[in-house]
Amino acid sequence: MMIDSRAATPSFAVQALMYVGLAFVMLGNYYGYDSVAPVAEQLSRELHFTDTQIGTLNAIYSLPNIFLVVVGGVLVDRFTARRMVVGTTALCLVGAVVTALGAQFPVMAAGRLLFGIGSETLSVATTVALAQWFAGRYFALLFAANLSLARLGSYLADRSPSFAHGLYARGWQPPMWLAVGFAVASFAGALVYFVLDRREAPRGTLALPPPPERFDWRHLLSFRSEYWLLVGTCVAFYSVIFPFRSTFAIKYLQQAQGLSLDAASTLNSYVFLAAVFATPVFGLILDRTGRNARLLAAGAVLLPLSFLVLVTLPGSAGLSTTLLGVSFSFLPAVLWPTVVRYSPPEQLGTAYGIMTTLQNAGLFGANIIAGYLNDTSGASAVNPGGYAPMLWFFGLLSLAAFLCTAALLWFDRGSAARSAAPAGHGGQLT
C-alpha cells in the first residue's frame, strides 16, 4: 500500500542529506573503477604488463558479477538496500587497498576482483534506494543528477594526472592509494545513508511491497519484451564505453595520437565532464516528454559515429570524444529509469540485477578481446596502426547498441498501433 507522501515524507534537509550520501557512495565507486586507465601506460612500462593483463584488471572486476549480481539484486530485495549499500562499499574499500598493495599482477588482480564483487551489487542497491525514496514525477532527473555526481568520480580519475601530478611522478602505486582515499569517502557516504534510511524508512515516499520469500527463476520469463531490448542495448553500449574509455583510451591517445599523459587523460575526461552537466538535462527531458525509445535511439546513434570518425578522419580525437561524451550523457539517463516502467516493484532489484549481470558479461569479454587484439596486432607507439582492430571491434558493438534501440522503437510503435488506446499513451514508450 502506498504511503501518503504529503503527510509522511521526511523533511527536505533529510532527503537532501540522504541524496548527497548516495552521491558520495557512487562518486568514490566510479573513481575506483576508472583508476586503472591513467596508470595503464605506467603499468606497461614499470611492471611490464601486457595489454591483455591491463584489460584483465577491468575484466576481472566484471567476472564475478556475471554470476553474482542477480543474486545481489535478490539480496537487495530481501535484506534492504541500506544493508547492502554499507556491506558492498566496505568490500570495495578492501578491494581498493589490496589493489594498491599489489606490485605483482596476481595481487592486483585479486584486489580488482574484490572491488568488482562489491561494486556492481552496490550499483543495484543504490539504484533501488533512489527508486524507493525519490520515485515520482522527477525520478529520471534525480537519477540522472545522481549519475552525474557519480561520473564526477570518473572525471576526477582522468584528471588525477594533473591535480595529483606528484603522485604519478613517483610511480604507479601512489595513484592507487589516492583511489583508496576515494573508497573511504564512498564508505562514509554509505554510513550517512544507512543511518538516515533506518530512521526514516517507515515514512519513505515509495512503500514497496514485502520482498519475495525466495527467488524463482521463472521470474526471468515474466519480464516484458521491451525489458530485454533494454538489456541488449545496455550490454552492447557499456561493452564499448567502459573497456574503451576506462581501460585503453588514454594509452591509445598517448601511443597512437602522440599525446602526453596529461593531455590524453584531460581529453578522455571530457567524456565524463560532459556527462556531469548534460545527463540531468536529458533526465529532465525524459520526465517532461516520456519519449523513452526515441531518446534512446538518438543517444545510441552517436556511438558508432564516434568510432567511424576516429577510424576514418586523421586528427579527429577531439570530435570523436565529443560524440562519445554526448552519447554517454544521453543514453544512460534514459536507459536506467526506463527499467522501472517494466519491472514490478517487488522485482525491481532483480530486474536491475539481471541487466547488470549481463552487462558485466559484456564488459568482461570486451576488455579481454580488446587487449588481445592490441597484443596480437602489436599496437604500440611505434605501431599505432595496431590499434585499428580494437577500434573496429568497438565500432561494431556500437552499431549493435543502436540496432537494439531501433528495434525497441519499432516494437513499441507496433504495440501502440495494435492497442489503439484512445485514452492516451499511459505507460507505452514513444
Regions found by a protein language model. Give the residues of each.
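Extracytoplasmic gate region of multi-pass secondary transporters
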Residues: 36-37, 225-272, 276-279, 366-367
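C-terminal transmembrane helical hairpin of 12-TM major facilitator-type secondary transporters
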Residues: 292-338
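Helix-breaking motifs and short loop linkers at transmembrane-helix boundaries and internal kinks
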Residues: 48, 80, 101-107, 118, ...
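Helix-to-loop junctions at the C-terminal end of transmembrane segments
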Residues: 68-80, 278-291, 374
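Conserved MFS/SLC helix-loop-helix module at the cytosolic interface between two early adjacent transmembrane helices
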Residues: 67-106
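Cytoplasmic helix-loop-helix junction between adjacent transmembrane helices
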Residues: 105, 111-150
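Juxtamembrane intracellular "pre-TM" segments in multi-pass secondary transporters
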Residues: 3-12, 197-231, 425-430
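Helix-loop-helix hairpin linking two adjacent transmembrane segments in secondary transporters
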Residues: 145-198
